[in-house]
């Protein structure tokens, strides 16, 4: 995701104010959070200590536990002509251009597909080593049964391949235990997030075609699912929609020392098209299908959220801005850990697992008293 540009859309916005609960109740919650954090740190050990065998009726019971899928590296040959012409660029950019035409990678781990009643698919970008982040999401806002108001939600984590750590056996077991890991056979890298976007769109169209909406975000976002569902109540999934923290008039970064550097040879225009910050946004079923189709013919771009904005422009669509998406975090003078502020938002970016657990405990506390205040509007 690109650094925020100095614009009115990214200045601090108003929100609710409130007080943190104090006394024995707060102390009890903090003790629970500490205990839970320690438990999650032992997740890997617990997974290995649990019985590997599934019940006899489980269709995967015959699969050996200690046989994780082996990456089948792409046989796509490098484009040496492009590589020779880009010798003046940083190595990461040369590598991207050399293999930009390679866009078909195998699935290594795959969850079950969506049911016909799936209302919201939560597609979260993660990495193999982010075990604690995935555990935090599953135990907080990803506990979809407690948030869904009778509507069916599905959680999926999106991964590439990141060497041998953590052990592939652990990731394979995590996949079988939670049925929410979607991993492809390409290397985890910032420039490969566009590959992750393309392969996600393909998978959704194939495995979750009936999902009404999809929320795509990073594994360090806090999503207030009830607020997202309330917002979506007025939208038809058959109509185009992509809503989030929209960035307009962003300039390509020409500084070769930052990872967002884009040389003029890769993008000559003065500004990027409008795009939603990649920390998190929501799109309708109709937009998912149209994006997937246009992406198949689009030239890949190193920055994934800008790439989506480029595809939207080709479709003649504009992303919708909503102040409830805080993809650059909560700015001062607002309190970034005010639970009353979170109660009025849809998504907040850049929370650690401990902050996520803390905010979950506070936001879901029925005894929390908040002063009246406006809920962010579109």
Curated annotation (Swiss-Prot):
The top EC class is: transferase
Q: Give the metabolic or biological pathway.
A: Protein modification; protein glycosylation
Is Transcription regulation among this UniProt entry's keywords?
Answer: no
What tissues is it present in? Mainly expressed in brain tissues such as whole brain, hippocampus, amygdala, cerebellum and caudate nucleus. Also expressed in colon, esophagus and kidney.
Q: Which residues are glycosylated?
A: 192
Q: Which domain of life is it from?
A: Eukaryota
Q: How does it sit in the membrane?
A: Single-pass type II membrane protein
Q: Could you tell me what reaction this enzyme catalyses?
A: a beta-D-galactosyl-(1->4)-N-acetyl-beta-D-glucosaminyl derivative + UDP-N-acetyl-alpha-D-glucosamine = an N-acetyl-beta-D-glucosaminyl-(1->3)-beta-D-galactosyl-(1->4)-N-acetyl-beta-D-glucosaminyl derivative + UDP + H(+)
Query: What ranges are annotated Lumenal (topological domains)?
Result: 50-378
Function description? Beta-1,3-N-acetylglucosaminyltransferase involved in the synthesis of poly-N-acetyllactosamine. Has activity for type 2 oligosaccharides.
What is the protein name given in its UniProt record? Answer: N-acetyllactosaminide beta-1,3-N-acetylglucosaminyltransferase 4
What taxonomic lineage is listed for the species of origin?
Eukaryota, Metazoa, Chordata, Craniata, Vertebrata
Gene name of the record: B3GNT4
């Amino acid at each position: 995701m690109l650094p925020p540009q100095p614009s009115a859309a990214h200045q601090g916005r108003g929100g609710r104010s409130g007080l943190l609960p104090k006394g024995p109740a707060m102390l009890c919650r903090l003790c629970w959070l500490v205990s839970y954090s320690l438990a999650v740190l032992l997740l890997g050990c617990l997974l290995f200590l649990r019985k590997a065998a599934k019940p006899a009726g489980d269709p995967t019971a015959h699969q050996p536990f200690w046989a994780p899928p082996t990456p089948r590296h792409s046989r796509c040959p490098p484009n040496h002509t492009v590589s020779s012409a880009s010798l003046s660029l940083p190595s990461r950019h040369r590598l991207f251009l050399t293999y930009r035409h390679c866009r078909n990678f195998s699935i290594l781990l795959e969850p079950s597909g969506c049911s016909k009643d799936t209302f919201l698919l939560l597609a979260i970008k993660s990495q193999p080593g982010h075990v604690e982040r995935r555990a935090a999401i599953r135990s907080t806002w990803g506990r979809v049964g407690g948030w869904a108001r009778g509507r069916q939600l599905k959680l999926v984590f999106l991964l590439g391949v990141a060497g041998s750590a953590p052990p592939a056996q652990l990731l394979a077991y995590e996949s079988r235990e939670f049925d929410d890991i979607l991993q492809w056979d390409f290397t985890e890298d910032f420039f490969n997030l566009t590959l992750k976007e393309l392969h996600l769109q393909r998978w959704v169209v194939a495995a979750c075609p009936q999902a009404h909406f999809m929320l795509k975000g990073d594994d360090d976002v806090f999503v207030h699912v009830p607020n997202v569902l309330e917002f979506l109540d007025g939208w038809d999934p058959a109509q185009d929609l992509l809503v989030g923290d929209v960035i307009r008039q962003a300039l390509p970064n020409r500084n070769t020392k930052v990872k967002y550097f884009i040389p003029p040879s890769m993008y000559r225009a003065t500004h990027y098209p409008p795009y939603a910050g990649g920390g998190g946004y929501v799109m309708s079923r109709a937009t998912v299908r149209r994006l997937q189709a246009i992406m198949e013919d689009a030239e890949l771009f190193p920055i994934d959220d800008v790439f989506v904005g480029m595809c939207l422009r080709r479709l003649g669509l504009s992303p919708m801005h909503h102040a409830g998406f805080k993809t650059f975090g909560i700015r001062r003078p607002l309190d970034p850990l005010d639970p009353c502020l979170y109660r009025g938002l849809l998504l907040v970016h850049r929370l650690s697992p401990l902050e996520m657990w803390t905010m979950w405990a506070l936001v879901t506390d029925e005894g929390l008293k908040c002063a009246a205040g406006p809920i962010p509007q579109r």
